[in-house]
């Protein structure tokens, strides 16, 4: 019996040692995982962007074996912070992708799908239905609100739409303005609805989302013109990023399903639902050429001439 007891104690001790070694090995494995950062362009504000894309960052960490850190970045600071090497992966709107591709040879990973046009979207110029305005040429001397200047479908696409219709916004319009603060696209749509401006540059996706959420009725507006469809938000990677990791991240994005979840603050969260997206699609750099042509006509980065 004494021999059996000694054997049992020895076995238990050995098992404890093995468990401890396994735990230490696991800890070391986690500690030794590579660490990288993803810069996310702030959409409406930092808080909203954090809530939307923290689960996405966690998902990419789980799928690639890299500890990715979420980094919120102001649109106007994005290129400067990327150039400094603060982050190697990017999530931004499509004009920032074009700028970073032109200046820093950014690698295209995948394009975000959201709304009825999937990985593409468009800009529109809207007026109230009862405004009496039925075509772009009737905006002469009128007030119009645009989105931020680096908003592809809130500024660039609509400005270009006017130019292609023979209208110089600088001399043709009465005045134009950009709302202050967050949620600029929503504010523009409301400004048109409540008569604060005569017309607005509204992303078609915002009209779709606000209508679906019951905030507006599209029947209250007339779309005077719509731009061609252009790519929506885009994931990219710095040109010196390890190729195998680039492919891992691309595959993880393209494989993302509505049922995929991660744990955030002790709660299981659906990644796509949290990010307000419908998945990702693999576009080519050539698909971004319409943005390049718009930017050249509008005299915008990365092609502006002073």
Regions found by a protein language model. Name each.
Residues 106-118, 172-176, 211-229:
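Short beta-strand->loop
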Residues 31-98:
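Extracytoplasmic small-molecule ligand-binding "clamshell" domains
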């Amino acid at each position: 019996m004494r021999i059996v007891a000694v054997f049992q104690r020895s076995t238990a001790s050995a098992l404890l040692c093995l468990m401890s070694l396994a735990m230490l090995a696991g800890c070391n494995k986690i500690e030794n995982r590579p660490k990288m950062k993803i810069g996310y362009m702030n959409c409406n504000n930092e808080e909203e962007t954090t809530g939307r894309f923290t689960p996405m960052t966690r998902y990419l960490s789980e799928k690639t074996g890299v500890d990715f850190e979420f980094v919120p970045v102001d649109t106007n600071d994005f290129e400067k912070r990327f150039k400094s090497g603060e982050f190697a992966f990017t999530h931004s709107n499509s004009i920032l992708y074009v700028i970073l591709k032109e200046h820093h040879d950014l690698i295209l990973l995948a394009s975000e799908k959201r709304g009825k046009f999937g990985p593409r979207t468009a800009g529109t110029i809207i007026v109230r239905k009862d405004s009496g305005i039925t075509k772009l040429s009737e905006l002469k001397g009128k007030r119009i609100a645009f989105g931020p200047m680096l908003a592809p479908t809130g500024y660039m696409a609509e400005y270009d739409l006017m130019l292609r219709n023979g209208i110089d916004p600088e001399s043709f319009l009465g005045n134009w303005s950009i709302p202050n603060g967050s949620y600029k696209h929503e504010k523009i749509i409301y400004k048109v609805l409540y008569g604060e401006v005569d017309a607005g540059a509204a992303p078609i996706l915002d009209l779709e989302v606000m209508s679906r959420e019951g905030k507006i009725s599209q029947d209250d507006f007339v779309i005077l013109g719509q731009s061609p469809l252009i790519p929506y938000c885009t994931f990219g990677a710095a040109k010196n990023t390890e190729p195998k990791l680039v492919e891992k991240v691309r595959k993880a994005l393209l494989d993302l399903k509505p049922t995929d979840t991660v744990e955030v603050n002790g709660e299981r969260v659906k990644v796509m639902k949290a990010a307000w997206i419908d998945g990702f699609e693999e576009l080519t750099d050539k698909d971004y050429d319409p943005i390049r042509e718009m930017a050249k006509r509008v005299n915008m980065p990365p092609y502006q001439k002073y």
